[in-house]
Amino acid sequence: MIDRNGYRSNVGIILLNSKNEVFWGKRIRQDSWQFPQGGIKPGESPEQAMYRELTEEVGLRPWHVQILGRTRDWLRYDVPAQWIKRDWRGNYRGQKQIWYLLRLLGSDCDVSLHTSGRPEFDAWRWNQYWVELESVVEFKRQVYRQALTELARLLNRPPVPFGYSGYEKYDYSASGPLTGSTAKQSE
């Protein structure tokens, strides 16, 4: 759905492992890396869209992850004219996104890039939370910085027992050390 200002409603996903490393997917047949993301369908909430995109692009189900938080407002980026589909030209400017920070409760073997007929990624890796964004397409970099910065305060949120939502008793202001990255190729 495109709003009256020309922005398509979308969700972005920052997925953390137990070391606070983030999931990066390599765009199929391209050299760019990105976080999972996708459009919100009519009648779908941002959270429902996030779970659908997580399953379609990464193969993870709701029980594989814990929601740590989301951005307070929509983050927007404009898409350069040469990237806009012909039938969208004239009324489409770009994307507006709600970003979710998730903790993987499962393991690496739960990730599958081939759960849909049209995979988005052909490889994936874990990388430090704060990493240079040169491998991200240029027009998305500022939104990535905004989302990572806003959600960084949640990095040290401890694992929460299933069904418990009492985050208010924890102090999430500190940040811990990050380690190197590991890469995974599509099977």
UniProtKB/Swiss-Prot annotation:
One of the GO biological process terms: mRNA catabolic process
Segments carrying motif Nudix box: 38-59
Necessary cofactors: a divalent metal cation
EC number of this enzyme: 3.6.1.-
Primary enzyme class: hydrolase
InterPro entries, per database record: Nudix_hydrolase, NUDIX_hydrolase-like_dom_sf, NUDIX_hydrolase_CS, NUDIX_hydrolase_dom, RppH
Tagged with keyword Hydrolase: yes
Residues annotated as domain Nudix hydrolase: 6-149
CC terms in the record's Gene Ontology section: cytoplasm
Pfam family, one: NUDIX
Protein origin, superkingdom: Bacteria
Gene Ontology MF: a single term: mRNA 5'-diphosphatase activity
Keywords: Hydrolase
PANTHER family: M7GPPPN-MRNA HYDROLASE (PTHR23114:SF17)
Function: Accelerates the degradation of transcripts by removing pyrophosphate from the 5'-end of triphosphorylated RNA, leading to a more labile monophosphorylated state that can stimulate subsequent ribonuclease cleavage.
Family from the record: Belongs to the Nudix hydrolase family. RppH subfamily.
Name the record gives this protein: RNA pyrophosphohydrolase
Organism for this UniProt entry: Nitrosospira multiformis (strain ATCC 25196 / NCIMB 11849 / C 71)
Lineage: Bacteria, Pseudomonadati, Pseudomonadota, Betaproteobacteria, Nitrosomonadales
Gene that this sequence comes from: rppH
